[in-house]
Amino acid sequence: MKEKKLNILSVDCDWIQNLKSQQDLISFVIPLLFKDSQIILNYDNHKIYPYFLHGYDEYNLWNIDHHHDYAYDQYLKLDEGNWIYHLSNVFLKKINYVWINNPESVHPTHFNRQKINDKLKSYKFDPCLSFISQQTFDKIFICCSPEPEYNTHLGITTYKIIERIMNDKPTS
């Protein structure tokens, strides 16, 4: 019997740290907006949580983000920094997680790496968008993360550009 898989791309615009990364992300994301994926826009990253539906054997999550979002200080509380930890508790050993980070991103601590190994099916990270070979996603979740301690004006501007494209996109 064929495994039922859900492929989700999560894009947090705080990944953008400079003009080059803005250009790279826009070039990567814009073509995906016109494919047959469900596109979800939201200001807050942890609002992705309800889009992980039960009934799948495997969840493939690609997360383009400056932060790993697995578990930070208050990891028992569902928020923008801990949503993957909460998903990994619900979908134990079913999530293949690929984090597209920045060279400046802080990687999970040893304590969190142990939790990652115990709860995720797999975990990989890379700083290059080209590491994402998948071109078809069931869902694409794009968030802004507008808090000034997390994002830059380039990241917020990119989110607003994507939001405008989606608002102007003809519906079928």
Residue spans of the language-model regions?
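Conserved alpha-helical scaffold segments that buttress catalytic/binding sites
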Residues: 2-172
